[in-house]
Amino acid sequence: MKKIISSIAIALACTAAYANTPQLDTLFESDWQWTLSHSPETATTLGDNRYNHKLSNTSLAAARVYNKHQQDMLKEALKIKRDSLSGQELISYDQFVLEKQQAIRAAELYPYTVQPITQIDGLQITLPSLVSQTPFNNAFDYHNYLARLHAIPAYVDGIIEQLQENMKTGWVAPKVIIAPVPGQLHDLRLHLDESEFGTPFHHIPANVPRPEVFAARGKKELSEHVAPALLKLENFLITQYLPACRDSIAASSLPAGMPYYDFMVKNGTTTDLTAQQIHDIGLTEVARIKAEMQRVMDQVGFKGSFAEFTVFLNTDPRFFYTNSDDLLNGFRDIIAHVYQVLPTMFAHLPKAQAEVKPIPLLGSEQQPAAYYNPGPDDGSRSGYFAVNVSNLNTRAKWEMETLTLHEAIPGHHLQISIAKEATDLPKFRRNGWYNAFGEGWALYSEGLGYEMGFYKDPYSKFGNLNDELFRAARLVVDTGIHALGWSREQAITYLNENTANPPNDNQVEIDRYIAWPGQALGYKIGQLKINQLRAKATTALGDKFDLRAFHNAVIDNGPIPLSVLETQIDLWISQQQAKH
């Protein structure tokens, strides 16, 4: 990624600029407003309710408009004199240019959506989830929601058009990740009224006039527009798309070949590491962490093998709740403890408090153990830590501490909330996402548990090590699947033999990596970089090193590429040395 940013600088230096350079904030704001107007779902999740009556245009024509917009924005950015910028303006400028170049490169590989729907990402998951982030405070909100429901058939038609283009061009998904989708659509269609789609009509606020009218209109939209659209997509997948899907699972087997996976690796890690280099890093880290796990097994006096210990951890009743409320409250207790010690780790904290909510049961079996859902920009709702309460016999107590530190605080909630509250940054940076930075920070945060008084129970320590091992194993299996010719069964077996996760979870995870090439690489690569920078700062500053200040130096500027983070921390080290 350093090479990418360097090339940006060279290109800018050679580009003629207008005598009257446009203000950066005008360019950023123009692009941001275009993004919100063309992605109403994004606007809703950020608390901007101007487009709550709409859904994105999912047609091929809309994709071409998007690609043209990225090109136009890059041209406008290159008219600005880069050497006239400094500080945050320069960081923002370089990030903006980089993001546009990445979008343009993606379109060069394939100009439309590569996978418009999968078992982990598609309208059957995203649209119901969107409802929980939509306001229902007055009649206007309900009119907006009815209009959005009415737009679902056109949204589905666009998805089908994208899938048809996939079939024409050979950019079809692997069968294994599409096979569950018709069932997901079927279940949602049969339970629309009790799903998130129908919930707003069961709890209409008292201030909304004639609630029975809205309830009736809602039922009509669901039965006459949403259900037929879902059935149409379900039938299309079964009769046309699924038979055309590929048996191969590697991203490198797509028409663009290995360059496509190389792009996804660069996108997921913001580094220039090759797939083979990442694979080798993963193997080294797996061996190191497994040795630490063996020491925990020795500590608790377990005499069997690693595989036998994982069976014990995943079957002994002492490690599981039998009631979902108890599980949720257990996570809430951990968060309360974290908040007590957080000031010892950070110089300043966000105002927004983390909440815990259950993942909706419908479709939850294809969802991870937990994830983080950010709050809107206006702070009207906190982000929340979503917990999977299905299959309680797989939600182990020994992984709860490390999971909380990752998904909530000081992981995703803390990092994302601080970014959202940094009003001096342009909106695209406050709400941006670099996988290696965000997930790397969250994995690094798990490691902070030792300094915060967690993992005192050896089984919880094993849980933390297992989570780190899991992220290291991802480096092995993601590159194995997409670059080195691994089969799905080989990848599942590797996770089963090298992690303490339940076999069913490992199967779900492998299918996730198949559906989302390169994404799983960011966690470990990002964590290793932050650990490296902390060690560098500690050595350079000695007894002047301030851990609280270091942490805020890492996250106070919003999500950034790892190469930019390294430059930023080098500058911070120099500033600290100058102070002393």
Name each model-derived stretch.
Residues 1-18:
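Gram-negative bacterial Sec-dependent N-terminal signal peptides
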Residues 19-580:
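N-terminal maturation segment of proteins
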